[in-house]
From Swiss-Prot:
Residues 1-20 form the signal peptide. Belongs to the conotoxin I3 superfamily. Keywords: Cleavage on pair of basic residues, Disulfide bond, Ion channel impairing toxin, Knottin, Secreted, Signal, Toxin. Expressed by the venom duct. GO terms for molecular function: ion channel regulator activity; toxin activity. GO terms for cellular component: extracellular region. It comes from Conus geographus (Geography cone). It comes from the Eukaryota. This is Conotoxin G11.1. InterPro entries: Conotoxin-I_CS. Residues 21-45 form a propeptide.
C-alpha cells in the first residue's frame, strides 16, 4: 500500500513539474497551488491548533517547534 502511494505521488509530482497546461484556468491555478504547496517551503505549525510557529514560544504548552510543534525527548531550545 505504501509503495502504491509513493508511486502515485511520484507520478503526480512528475506531471506537475512538466508544466503541462490545461485549457481550464481553474484547473491550471489548482495544479499550480498544489505544486507550490507540495514543493514550497514547509511552514511550521502547531500540531494541536494548526497555527504557524516560528519559535518554541509559539507552540502549545511544553511542545517544541521542530517542523511542527511536537513533544521532544530533549528540552526545547
Amino acid at each position: 500500500m505504501k509503495l502504491f502511494l509513493a508511486i502515485v505521488l511520484i507520478l503526480m509530482l512528475q506531471f506537475l513539474s512538466t508544466g503541462a497546461e490545461t485549457s481550464d484556468n481553474h484547473a491550471s491555478r489548482s495544479t499550480t497551488a498544489l505544486r507550490d504547496w507540495l514543493l514550497g517551503p514547509k511552514a511550521k505549525r502547531c500540531a494541536v491548533t494548526h497555527e504557524k510557529c516560528s519559535d518554541d514560544y509559539d507552540c502549545c504548552g511544553s511542545l517544541c517547534c521542530v517542523g511542527i510543534c511536537a513533544k521532544t525527548i530533549a528540552p526545547c531550545k
